[in-house]
Design a protein with these regions (language model features):
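Function-determining sites in protein domains
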Residues: 1-152
Length: 152
């Protein structure tokens, strides 16, 4: 995660945390990333059980640099905090390298993220101290998304 510039592809997706494992999936072809290159669950149009509700949005170099800075900073995380909220991610970030794939699911309701490496969950942490930084990047990536733009 420390150097996202090494990733071959970097895409962001809107996902529906409230509909995990239920409801209809988006129509075929709405995710424009080949599934053979994606780390997904057994459903072709979801990421770890969360339905994908947008096309892939390429993450630009500036956003990638900002994400690298925020995600690699130990001060981003509240290491000794436990929250009682339900993790309902609305955004997934997917970084694909030659030997490693990293997915980061972000929940702005509880300011938590989950990290998956090559399909295995390797972390879950609170990011309250850097919420505004992550939200700024996500708002830039999804300028037409009313739900994302309404977050503050």
């Amino acid at each position: 995660i420390a150097d996202l510039s090494q990733a071959r592809t970097c895409n962001a997706y809107r996902i529906d945390g409230y509909a995990a494992g239920e409801g209809p999936l988006p129509p075929p072809g709405t995710v424009d990333e080949p599934q053979s290159q994606a780390v997904t669950s057994d459903k072709p149009q979801d990421i770890y059980g969360y339905p994908v509700v947008s096309s892939a949005v390429p993450i630009d170099d500036l956003s990638r640099a900002n994400l690298s800075k925020v995600l690699s900073d130990p001060g981003t995380y509240l290491w000794d905090v436990a929250k009682g909220c339900e993790f309902l991610p609305g955004v997934a970030l997917r970084f694909t390298g030659s030997n490693v794939n990293v997915d980061i699911l972000i929940c702005f309701s509880c300011d938590e993220l989950e990290i998956y490496r090559n399909g295995e969950r390797v972390g879950h942490e609170d990011f309250d101290p850097r919420r505004s930084d992550l939200l700024g990047v996500v708002k830039k990536l999804f300028p037409e998304d009313e739900a994302i733009q309404a977050l503050n």
